[in-house]
Amino acid sequence: QFLLDKIEKIENKKHKAILALAYSTGMRVSEVCNLKQSDIDSKRMIITIRQSKGKKDRIVALSPKVLEILRTYHKAYWPKEYVFNGQFDLRYSERSCNQIVKQYLGKEYHFHLLRHSNATALLEAGTDLRIIQKHLGHASSKTTEIYTHVSTATLQNMNLPI
């Protein structure tokens, strides 16, 4: 809830779109920066992440809320090739994305936290670990297990056998 509250309050449309997209999809900072307009399919509500880590493509779901945020951003900035443009219509830099996280979430946070938080939120919502593994593009479920941090509230609400 902390991240959702923080993202909701951001007024800068580009910054809000970057953080909302990253948290919602679990995309890596490089994937967000390399994302092209043609990678977003708003009819099928999916995003194709091309040639990511391990040189593999993968597909992630696009939430209606994030699509709305992206459209609001797009109307304000009119990016061309890349979803998030930096100077001279080049892709937005990973350094800039990391600075956005620190600006809005705090200096102790980093962009990769959004990916971990996405995995944890999916697990706590009951998503199977194998689905999360595929969603994040992990070759091993061991890597996915590192990403998922079960909250104390989830442990307290567990249905114990006795």
Predicted regions and their residues:
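Conserved catalytic core of the tyrosine transesterase superfamily
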Residues: 1-162
